[in-house]
Amino acid sequence: MDGSGNGPDDRRGTVVNGPQQGEIWWAEAEDKRRPVLVVTRNEAISVLSSIVVAPVTRTVRNIPTEVALGAQHGLSSVCAASFDNLQPIRRVLLTSRVGRLGIDELEEICRAIRALADC
């Protein structure tokens, strides 16, 4: 997870066109800065002050409630978005875009949610 500030979307402290579902953003949490995967549907993001995200972790367990991420998504190492730990976060805490899932990978969000809810 890079965060070097050298990427075109890494404008710390400014929102670049706002987050969209399937994008990975740096989030400024109380205790540390960490990447998160935006889960909330696009139609709701602009009207909500908080959105649902899946935290990104380097601990990859290869379980159905994870979405695999890596360099192709703007991250510096192999990671996973953990849908077992979905959480709301204030939109203003998302500071810079890291990357995004490919159009063909967006279904992975739905798959992980179905696994989370066991449906």
Model-based region annotation:
Residues K32-A71:
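Compact nucleic-acid interaction/catalytic patches
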